[in-house]
Design a protein with these regions (language model features):
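Active-site-adjacent structural elements that line small-molecule/cofactor binding pockets in enzymes
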Residues: 1-269
Length: 269
């Protein structure tokens, strides 16, 4: 927070059992409770007070009978610019999205389609918002995708840019998780791409990554990225705003990145 001049946002996510148990080496247990504990401890830490916390997955200091017994409440040495740094939660599935809307400052969805996201997450967001502490303010939403702005991005050239997103979507929908425990595949199906999601996963897990990328629906590419002439992008941004998006998280492609961001700013302003 100090290095960025008070612009830092901390992002949390529970990922899935394949990554947590295969890469981090700990059981995938109580993921939502763990994230809530992390959020609570972080908020206590930033207030520069000695941290004493007892949650279902995190206890600070360690309880009596664990460790050496030498642990004691400590406080942070470095001073952040703010004592309430925004925490965004990257969540995808039902109860975790509800918990995000209740506890976090912001939400980081993936493959965000502003016209369809309510059919996937609407009920969960509403349930969490109903229990949200009013002092935390409105839930912030960060979404975007690739961005390329210009009259040249139509027809074949537009499709060439959108096709750049195919391998990444195929990786997540097809291979980011076990066959019966892939949250990204579930989201793709909830968007209405049931057959396509199954095909992507079948191809990816069989080693046909190119075929998996080719099976990504063209509509999904179109709706989850910002590629086209300025007028078209303006309409898309209006849809994002209507959906409640407060932060644009974009990857400039198809030209000079600085110029693309400047064009985006002009449209927003």
């Amino acid at each position: 927070d100090f290095v960025s001049g008070g612009r830092f946002i901390l992002c949390h996510g529970a990922t899935g059992p394949q990554v947590i148990e295969g890469f981090h080496g700990v059981p995938y247990e109580n993921p939502m409770a763990r994230i809530r504990d992390y959020i609570n401890v972080c908020r206590m830490t930033w207030k520069r007070e000695p941290v004493v916390y007892e949650g279902p997955t995190v206890q600070v200091p360690l309880p009596e009978g664990q460790g050496t017994g030498l642990g004691k409440p400590l406080k942070i040495i470095n001073h952040p610019v703010r004592n309430d740094i925004p925490i965004f939660w990257a969540s995808l599935m039902g109860l975790s999205v509800t918990a995000t809307a209740q506890y976090a400052d912001g939400w980081l969805p993936i493959f965000f389609d502003p016209e369809k996201f309510h059919q996937v997450w609407g009920d969960e967001l509403k349930a969490g918002t109903a229990k949200r502490d009013a002092n935390r303010g409105q839930l912030q939403i960060s979404a975007g995708g690739m961005v390329a702005i210009g009259d040249e991005f139509v027809g074949e050239k537009k499709q060439q840019i959108l096709d750049m997103a195919r391998p990444n979507i195929a990786l997540y929908v097809g291979g980011m998780g076990a066959r019966d425990k892939n949250f990204y595949n579930t989201i793709c199906q909830k968007y209405g791409y049931v057959d396509e999601a199954i095909e992507i996963q079948d191809r990816y897990l069989s080693g046909d990554k190119t075929g998996a990328a080719g099976a990504v629906p063209a509509e999904m590419l179109e709706k989850t990225n910002l590629v086209g002439p300025a007028g078209e992008i303006k309409e898309r941004l209006a849809a994002y705003k209507e959906a409640g998006v407060t932060h644009l998280s974009v990857s400039p492609v198809g030209g000079d990145a600085v110029s693309t961001v400047e064009k985006l700013r002009e449209i927003i302003d």
